[in-house]
């Protein structure tokens, strides 16, 4: 069980003695029980337990940050922090717009503020939580940006903030739980509206999993909406305001390539009479940004169903925004029929893709490929077309 942190323990974690101990055991192959015995023996039970928690978080942080092994987090802070490539992409927007100073109104572990500072921007960063600011301050030191970044423990909605462009990433977690209702985020939508008011520019970072229409109801209307995906997963929805907006209504961006698609929302692609020779699975950034129809129009593709994101056509196409799959067989989502298809194509393993189907990929695999019929690997698409559930065996075209 994770140690409940207090300010005293947080300050102990960033002390030289504890840092040296953590470094000492960084490369150890000792089992966790032996490591925590050493930690508690050297620093006491509470601090030792907190060190063990931090050690585990740092292992995960390496997936997000180049020097994550040296940084400081709580679990909620790490989970909300942007991956470094995403934060760098966002920071470049501020640079390109000509901003040399930014206010970060809810800085968390400091990752966004640090990335802005690394881009040469002066930053004043605020957070209401003292433990958070202890860690953010130390992270700024670890990353070597203290000349450009100042951390303040204060409620950004209660103090008079400096003028200039503002960065906002409202807290969407309480303890280990994600807060689904945006009205419960901190700062609240109303408070964020007040913080954005009269500023030359603002960047509001939001969850891509939240309904976009709900966000538009609650937050000030943005000048641009961008959805950013990283390595195939939608990571952020960003509302851009003022001089940070690029002049388009919607944008989908794929990282690390940096490829971008922009346009007006929700232009609807026509629906196909039947599924063609190829299925195209749009990148989630394209789906969340409402730009699937625009992409379909440009490439002469059609929806397989107006409420399902898959597109179809008869020509093989290459696009960073679309996975191209060659259709091998189609039938109703009946285990008996699908297993015949699996046997006929000598399928040994499948990757599941699904839309409009509630079953998990694991459950679908067990139901439709209960045993190996050969040594071939294909993609199996479970989806809905009108009122029917169908299964499509397909080959991913790399």
Located regions from the model:
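SAM-dependent transferase fold signal centered on methyltransferase-like domains
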Residues: 1-398
